[in-house]
Amino acid sequence: MKVEAFIPAVLLLCFGVMLCLKSSCALQIGNNNELKNYISWEDLRVVEDGRIERSFSIKENSNWVTTNANANANATNVRRVIVVDKNGGGDSVTVQGAVDMVPDSNSQRVKIFILPGIYREKVIVPKSKPYISFIGNESYAGDTVISWSDKASDLGCDGKELGTYRTASVSIESDFFCATAITFENTVVAEAGEQGRQAVALRIIGDKAVFYRVRVLGSQDTLFDDNGSHYFYQCYIQGNVDFIFGNAKSLYQDCDIHSTAKRYGAIAAHHRDSETEDTGFSFVNCDISGTGQIYLGRAWGNYSRTVYSNCFIADIITPVGWSDWKHPERQRKVMFGEYNCRGRGAERGGRVPWSKTLTRDEVKPFLGREFIYGDQWLRL
């Protein structure tokens, strides 16, 4: 072969390799950009091979400062972990302190690993800080507790009553949040009929959130499922009056729903107020137990929508099952349905006539993750 012919061939080969590498890099970047708009199991883990991955970024003097356990890792691609230890052995002694370390307009998953303990604080994850995970002790959610005790009649810094939504022990305002193995708690004890004792443990107003094996504990208005699409999987939720309420579109799958009512109360109070709103609560394969004689749901909104499917319902449900919130005009607008539930509390003989026993075709849109458009943002 002539030298003149060999050189162009080598150049073409090198050029081809460079193009392939560039394409591979572009594909990797594209995949990274795509992945941040999903929540996966990886976003709920911090321990691999028995060690904690300690890499995170904080913003200091408007510049990125990166701490990385692996000096060879690319700081823009690694998963980042901030450790919270109330005893001082981590990066922050408070959960809020760890949240504050995350830069505004964050575009990468940041995992906040919260070591066991009771963290008595109010926590807000602001809208400007998406892609945050709260991760506790994977063996038991009760080991890691975020707890506070505000109630609606308490006065805020402005001298005005807090009202319900400002009582939340933990407020999630950002998108693509997820949590596992954490207890969210409000310690205020309330009974049906008491005034000013609404006390929220967890409020979610951000879109596309996942809660896996968390506990949410309270009495009245425990879980404010306010707005957005949310997935609760294998969670434990406890309260007595309207203890799951709001206007989100949420799927509760394989959850334990536990009533602590001494007399009467209600599980769900959905606030859909227009037939054009694409919102609702769907409870699938849940175990509903506890005490009292409570409603499955109350019509907080004119077009409230709540469905129970394939659930075990203990003998704690008042025979009528559902309440129109003393607004009889809502009876023809709400969507309160049950499908294939079992247990004494599932007997529909005494149900209000404006609730529905759903058919298989009618319940199908409520049964899976497609109810919350999970194919667009879940990789679980």
UniProtKB/Swiss-Prot annotation:
Disulfide bonds join 235-255. One of its GO terms (molecular function) is pectinesterase activity. Residues 1-26 form the signal peptide. Substrate binds at residues 164, 198, 298, 300. GO terms for cellular component: extracellular region. This is Pectinesterase QRT1. The gene is QRT1. Its EC number is 3.1.1.11. It catalyses: [(1->4)-alpha-D-galacturonosyl methyl ester](n) + n H2O = [(1->4)-alpha-D-galacturonosyl](n) + n methanol + n H(+). Expressed in flower buds, siliques, developing guard cells, floral nectares, at the stigmatic surface, in the hypocotyl-root transition zone and the area of lateral root emergence. Not expressed in mature leaves. It comes from Arabidopsis thaliana. The active site is at residues 221, 242. Pathway: Glycan metabolism; pectin degradation; 2-dehydro-3-deoxy-D-gluconate from pectin: step 1/5. The record marks 220 as: Transition state stabilizer. Its main location: secreted. It comes from the Eukaryota. The keyword Hydrolase applies. Belongs to the pectinesterase family. The keyword Glycoprotein applies.
